Amino acid sequence: MKSNKNIMKKLSVFFALVILGSCASEHISNSDSAPEIQLNPESTIIGKTSDNGKTEAFLGIPFAQPPVGKLRWAPPEALNDVGHVFHAHHFAPACMQADRITRWYKNVVKGFGGDPEVVIKPAVSEDCLYLNIWRPSFEENKDKTYPVIVYIHGGSNKAGWSYEPNYIGHRMAEEKVIVISVAYRLGAFGFFSHPAFEYSNFGLMDLVESLRWINKNIDAIGGDASRITVMGESAGAGNIDYLMAIPSSKGLFSRAIHQSSGSAIRNQATREDHIPLGLKLSSELLGADGINVTQKLRDAEAEKVLAVSEKVYKGHYFDNAVDGKSVFETFTDTLKLEKLHPVDLLIGSNEHESLMYLDKTESVGNWLKNQLGIDNSDNLRKLLNVSSNKRDQLNVLATASGFTCPAINLAKGVAATRDQSWVYYFTRQRDGEMAESMGAYHGAELPYVFDTHDDWLPTSQVDRRLTKTMKNYWTNFAKTANPNGLYLPNWPRFTVNSSKILVMGNDISNALHPSLELCEYLESRFATP
């Protein structure tokens, strides 16, 4: 294991590069060796080759018109041209947000014994609809097309960016897939309901527009249009739920990788539910003046909108809402009616999703009453006998209700429509006393999938072996809709008749999910867990 000093040095350098990369792209002279994407006869995107020559990167490519001015709180408009020559060497600014994800990274670094002050927030802008592409070196494989993985970041739909340390895609691209990470409007800029505007789910529509751009330019990128996989974690996975359901995204992808989210099943909001907060934001920004509200809201400074929204929406989860324009029914209704798009699914959650977010003073009984509105019955107590530790019991409850049970329900729904489902349970805990206190936390699986340990995490040989295995599972799924492959432990398909899953920790095994009975109990108490 590396020393904390070396880890922190690498992390400092990495975040410095991230911040530098989020600045405006500088003009770098073209050369014969620079990789290119020829979008059309008039537009060329110039990227750069990785140090080992195995992959190419094209960073900060616009996929829609900037959502500013008249396009604030409007559906994204297609971008037809990136210019004659576009130098894609730097990441674009992140979408407007406070420092929530920066604080999250600080907490994780601190949890592993590092100095949280090395983590720096990236530049932000309302002009933020950009994507990044990592692909296998194209010069050696001009006649090949590759499966495409489109990654959607998390952050409660109010924070996060497409090039966080966990999401850099070059090592995954070495497995002969194309990795594309996309941005979308966040917070009140992306999920806003107000009578002055017809639509509510602007961030979701941004994701649809990014998929349209990718499909339109798939040949130039070198991708296979029949093998496009959307992949997301946390809120990113929650948005994938709606991408699997809404009409505008049908046919834009055929596979989905869904990591650690249950928001679309747990939250069933309508536009009307969110309008009161939208009106409050408008009132805080504009006062009592009700004249020309639409124009005045669009004219308000982005920084002021962000600052006011942080107060108005404090504690609010920015979920997609049924608005009759972009989302026509709740995701749960679409799932129950078996109306999801035909999509194969790889889905799962981590053992300690909720551990770092729990109130240490909360009792199991109070949590059940406050969060689920039920009492701590004898039947439930029996199901929680997995641990005598109160905090562990709370984690089992919160993780099951918030992540595991919704994932199992979605896997069942997809399996019922004869599409394929594959379910995992991630249990690996890093070595060391500090790591043990965090467990297999929310987001812990990401460095294994992307193979980004060296950027900021201490890594043992166990972690490296698991990384190779998980990266192969994920990329095999993108290639064939089946994660299994040569020399990999068998991953059983999840069906309506067989609930076997893959457990990924210190070892790989097949088992029934340890929270399966708890999920069945919760489902018996509620229409949806």
Predicted regions and their residues:
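Non-catalytic accessory segments of hydrolases
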Residues: A24-S200, L204, L457-M470, A478-N490, ...
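Catalytic nucleophile serine of serine hydrolases
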Residues: G232-A235, S260
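Hydrophobic h-region of N-terminal signal peptides that target proteins for export
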Residues: L17-A24
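Substrate-access "cap/lid" subdomains that shape
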Residues: K216, K250, Q259-L368, Q393-A400, ...
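Alpha/beta-hydrolase fold nucleophile elbow
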Residues: I221-E233
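Short glycine-enriched nucleophile-adjacent loop
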Residues: A237-S249
